[in-house]
């Protein structure tokens, strides 16, 4: 274990994952802590996250990302994390689902350099890092799932990514407060499939997950 990661961090991750109903193997637990160590190390120079205190990163980043894992369907193979920033939730998604192909996308070169370093150091062969604006990405085939965490408004999230999915794609928007005002401006060809209020161990404030579909 890296000197940047404490036994308390390890225990908080184990306990929190159990409370979320997410089963972690020993290898997944180790990889998540390895990711945390890299996040702590690189954040000092690269400003990857506004969370400066490493003791807050387990709950506000790792567990917050794990909270949506029960809603990731097993039969969805290709996922895109839009505006991934420091890698949430894309890196935890790739760690927990090694047989899924996960792409993390960000327009900030410092952040994609960090994500590339995480891919190399943790040997995440199922992870692809793209440095680009989302509007300029042209995938060979539609993604099965497109997810964002505090990326933009619901209107922008759906409009900017509509070309990356189809009627079979799930769009997952991770939000704090319920975005009722944003849903009013949702494009007409998108519908809300479900809304989930999430409780993240160690996190104050509201958390919501909205799952969307696009009409054919």
Swiss-Prot record:
GO terms for cellular component: cytosol. The keyword Transcription does not apply. S-adenosyl-L-methionine binds at residues 83, 88, 134-135, 149. Its EC number is 2.1.1.170. It is found in: Cytoplasm. It catalyses: guanosine(527) in 16S rRNA + S-adenosyl-L-methionine = N(7)-methylguanosine(527) in 16S rRNA + S-adenosyl-L-homocysteine. Gene3D superfamilies: Vaccinia Virus protein VP39. Signal peptide: none annotated. It comes from the Bacteria. Pfam families: GidB. Keywords: Cytoplasm, Methyltransferase, rRNA processing, S-adenosyl-L-methionine, Transferase. GO terms for molecular function: rRNA (guanine-N7-)-methyltransferase activity. The keyword rRNA processing applies. Specifically methylates the N7 position of guanine in position 527 of 16S rRNA. PANTHER family: S-ADENOSYL-L-METHIONINE-DEPENDENT METHYLTRANSFERASES SUPERFAMILY PROTEIN (PTHR31760:SF0). Belongs to the methyltransferase superfamily. RNA methyltransferase RsmG family. This is Ribosomal RNA small subunit methyltransferase G.
């Amino acid at each position: 274990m890296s000197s940047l990661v404490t036994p308390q961090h390890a225990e908080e991750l184990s306990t929190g994952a159990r409370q979320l109903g997410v089963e972690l193997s020993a290898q997944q637990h180790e990889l998540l802590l390895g990711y945390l160590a890299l996040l702590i190390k690189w954040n000092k120079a690269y400003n990857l996250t506004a969370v400066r205190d490493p003791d807050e990163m387990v709950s506000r980043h790792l567990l917050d990302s794990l909270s949506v894992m029960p809603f990731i369907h097993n039969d969805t193979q290709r996922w895109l994390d839009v505006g991934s920033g420091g890698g949430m939730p894309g890196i935890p998604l790739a760690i927990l689902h090694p047989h899924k192909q996960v792409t993390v996308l960000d327009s900030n070169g410092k952040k994609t350099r960090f994500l590339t370093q995480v891919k190399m150091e943790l040997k995440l062969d199922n992870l692809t890092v793209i440095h680009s604006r989302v509007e300029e990405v042209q995938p060979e085939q539609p993604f099965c799932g497109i997810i964002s965490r505090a990326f933009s408004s619901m209107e922008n999230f759906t409009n900017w990514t509509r070309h990356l999915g189809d009627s079979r794609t799930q769009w997952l928007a991770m939000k704090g407060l319920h975005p009722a005002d944003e849903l009013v401006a949702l494009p007409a060809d998108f519908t809300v499939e479900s809304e989930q209020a999430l409780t993240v161990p160690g996190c104050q404030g509201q958390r919501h997950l909205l799952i969307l579909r696009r009409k054919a």
